[in-house]
Amino acid sequence: MSRRNSKVLYVSGEVAPFVRITALADFMASFPQTVEDEGFEARIMMPKYGIINDRKFRLHDVLRLSDIEVHLKDKVDMLDVKVTALPSSKIQTYFLYNEKYFKRHAWFPDLSTGNDARVTVEKIVFFNVGVLETLLRLGWKPDIIHCNDWHTALIPLLLKTMYASHEFFRNVKTLFSIHNAYRQGNFPLKHFQRLLPDEVCAGLHCVKDEVNLLFTGIDHVELLTTTSPRYAECLRGDTPEAFGVGKRLLERELPLHGMVNGLDARQWNPAIDKMIKKRYSTENMNGKVENRKMLLEEMKLPWRDGMPLVGFIATFDDYQGAKLLADSLEKLIAQDIQLVIIGFGDKKCEQRFQEFVVAHPEQVSVQAECSDSFLHLAIAGLDLLLMPSKVESCGMLQMSAMTYGTIPIARATGGIVETIQDHGENLGTGFLFDDYSVEGLSGRLADALRCFHDDECWPALVERAMSSDFSWHNTAEAYGQLYRNLLGK
């Protein structure tokens, strides 16, 4: 089998621009394309959520991929598949649909109790089994199935159990990538026992009748990766930030490969971006001002000459720094900035953010929805981006931001350290801080604002940031070698 014929199937719960919740969506939007550039054939499978616009993304039905039977122990659910090409590529992307499971919801909520947990487990099991049933009907045999995060973690186990006797899957290898170790997919065992055969349930990673899907993936996969060497080092340890992954790796004697995320310049380049108000480059930055004006208009904030526009774009949870941001708002607003907060999640954080909108309507604005086009506008229009993460695997938002001349203020954790050079005298591409505290965040914002108001410091910093090289090339080469090693080439 030649290198050109090696086939990789990527499985994920989110792929940009169709659905974006975390940085995984951006990984899925760009990385498979770079793998094709390395000589592999790539395809993608994801759920067809109700919020995905068929017409906008040119999804179409595939007659031979309709009415696929998905057997879940004592019942059979039907699966239909739609297909389109990943934008700006020829990569076939398959959307698995069942009205009961995916009509209204856009994500697999990680809920561990009550009816929501039962429903979520049904979605997960249906999707994971559905991927393998779709491959059987399609007749396209991947050499490697590359699974991403806990919601795809059943596939390696299913291949070893329910599908072990299928000749079609003989010699198919599995790779599992951890993008967020703190989201592990913990659910009561009883919900899986309702849907899966005993041989599958016996292979679930289960402690005190609770299944851990992330650990289930680790237990059965043949190759394990994560999004940066620094984050891999963190996960190998026994600190709270490893979330138990290090212990499980030791028990399995499984190496964890850290591979730095990259950025696809075909999708993220302010000089050619069709989704922003006006394009710009280091040679002419006037367009960034126009994007700032439009972003302010969209967020219903007034224009303020000389006042920096600062943003926070993330899921509202403690690990991505939403609580720290909420605790810091008083000190941040006092530094004479305008702040846009884009995201959703923890209801207490949402409420606290809205209280500041009421108290400071000309300085603070919050928006939950973030389409692909709006994300591009936000990245282009902001001056500074806050990333006060407690834990960060690598992320890609800071790379997009720097490419668009938006300077990140980020906590020095995980892959952040490998992608942002801390600002110093005539050096740096962003601002890093160590302490996960109000003082750490607000103090580093103060440092950034001093540079912002300095006519020599700021333009030089922006130019350095925009000149950063975040190419996927080296990572794609490294992944290509991992794939070939896995296939015994």
UniProtKB/Swiss-Prot annotation:
EC class name? transferase
Listed EC numbers: 2.4.1.21
InterPro entries membership: Glyco_trans_1 (IPR001296), GS/SS (IPR011835), Starch_synth_cat_dom (IPR013534)
Matches recorded under Gene3D superfamilies:
Glycogen Phosphorylase B
> For binding ADP-alpha-D-glucose, which residues are annotated in this chain's numbering?
R20
Name the domain of life.
Bacteria
Q: Which Pfam families match?
A: Glyco_transf_5, Glycos_transf_1
Pathway, according to UniProt? Answer: Glycan biosynthesis; glycogen biosynthesis
Q: Which UniProt keywords apply?
A: Glycogen biosynthesis, Glycosyltransferase, Transferase
Catalysed reaction per UniProt? [(1->4)-alpha-D-glucosyl](n) + ADP-alpha-D-glucose = [(1->4)-alpha-D-glucosyl](n+1) + ADP + H(+)
As for what it does, the entry says: Synthesizes alpha-1,4-glucan chains using ADP-glucose.
Record family assignment: Belongs to the glycosyltransferase 1 family. Bacterial/plant glycogen synthase subfamily.
- What is this protein called in UniProt? Glycogen synthase
Q: From the UniProt record, report the name of the gene that encodes this protein.
A: glgA
